[in-house]
Structures are given as C-alpha cells and as structure tokens.
C-alpha cells in the first residue's frame, strides 16, 4: 500500500513538473490565439465600415497629429490643459481611431520575428498584457509629415512572448503598421539603449514620419529601455 502511495505521489509530482515546464508555451499559444482573434475582429469591422466613416476616422487622427506638432505638445508634458487643447470635434484621445469596441486602433507586424500584435490606446497593464500600447501624447500611428508614434510592448512575460525578440531587429529591417485601410512600412534606422527617464527626447522631427518601438532591457533585469527607431519608407 505504501509503495502504491509513493508511486502515485511520484506521478503527481512528475505531472506538476511537466505542467510548470509547459506553462509558458501553452500560455503563449493561448495568448497568440487571442491576439489573432482581436486582429481578425478589427479587420472585419474595418472591412464592413463605409468608406466615408473610415476616411473620417483617419482625418480625425491626422488632425490630432497636426495639433500635437503645431502646439509642441509631448507626452512628458501632457496635463489636463494639453488634453483639452487636443480635442478633435469634442473627441478625446481614447475616442479616436475606434473601429470597434475592443479599443484596438490597428496592428503591428514584424516579419523578421514572426510577430503580429494589436495596438491599443495607452500603455496600461491591461493593454500591454494583450498587445502593444500606444503612448498618449505622441503621434497616432497613421503616418504623415512631422509625426513620431511611440509604441510600447512587454518583454519576457511568462504568459506571452510579445516584444521578447525585439532585440533581434537591426538597422535595415522593416516593420509594418496597419490602421484601417492605411498600411505603413517603416525601416529600422537606429537602435538605442537608454534609461527610462531618457525617453523624453523622443519628439517629432520636421517633415519626418517616424515610429519608435520600446521595450525593457536587459532581459529579466529591465533597468533600461531598448528603442527601435523606424522611418517610413512606404
């Protein structure tokens, strides 16, 4: 009897150990499936949208970006007065580029690392656990002259891969952003590692169309930020 109990305990411990080993892979697979569903729902909503409505959403985003540039507002100085000044026809940041109710404003694709993630408003934990967060106070990721969108992503979560492989990107690589029917391709021009407080220098440059991808580094330490700078080529 004692031997049977020990055998059962050994089996249970083995199964528990196997579960611990498999958890990251299984959890990541489930999270990727969720991300695919969110992107598919976004694509369907966009496809069913009238062209007039689609054009209006993009026009609002373009106007928001123009206001940012004209007023010289950056994310590190974003207070209530600045948010008020950035209203577009009474709409706040969170109400712009809403194709459907999930809060997805578009999606990011990086072919080199086989990544496809939804882009959400803001950089809350909820947003970063499910995809990429757009930093409020930076240009919305719809392209255009004198724009600089900043997108954040987590790295090394046990439940999802997200930006874990972002450090594999090199100068000359490309990534793509799709917002409604606007498809934008960016080429990596530079990579940097900075302290968190050094992000304040990321502002729009005259006549340039830029996006910076941001994640924590070194892996597992997270004391600095890895910046992948891209400039639009298509």
Regions found by a protein language model. Give the residues of each.
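N-terminal Sec-pathway targeting helices
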Residues: 1-14
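Solvent-exposed, non-transmembrane regions of membrane-associated and secreted proteins
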Residues: 14-234
């Amino acid at each position: 009897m004692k031997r049977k109990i020990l055998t059962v305990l050994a089996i249970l411990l083995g199964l528990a150990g196997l579960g611990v080993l498999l958890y990251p892979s299984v959890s990541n697979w489930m999270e990727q499936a969720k991300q695919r569903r969110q992107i598919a729902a976004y694509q369907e909503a966009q496809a069913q949208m009238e062209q007039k409505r689609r054009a209006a959403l993009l026009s609002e985003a373009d106007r928001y970006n123009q206001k940012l540039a004209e007023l010289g507002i950056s994310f590190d100085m974003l207070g209530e007065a600045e948010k008020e000044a950035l209203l577009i026809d009474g709409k706040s940041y969170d109400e712009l580029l809403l194709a459907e109710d999930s809060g997805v404003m578009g999606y990011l694709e990086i072919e080199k690392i086989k990544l496809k993630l939804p882009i959400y408003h803001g950089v809350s934990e909820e947003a970063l656990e499910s995809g990429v967060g757009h930093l409020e106070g930076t240009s919305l990721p719809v392209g255009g002259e004198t724009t600089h969108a900043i997108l954040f992503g987590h790295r090394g979560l046990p439940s999802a891969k997200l930006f874990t492989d972002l450090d594999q990107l090199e100068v000359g690589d490309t990534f793509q952003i799709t917002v409604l029917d606007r498809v934008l391709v960016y080429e990596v021009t530079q990579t940097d590692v900075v302290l968190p407080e050094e992000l304040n220098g990321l502002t729009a440059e005259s006549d340039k169309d830029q996006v910076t991808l941001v994640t924590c580094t070194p892996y597992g330490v997270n004391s600095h930020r890895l910046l992948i700078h891209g400039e639009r080529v298509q």
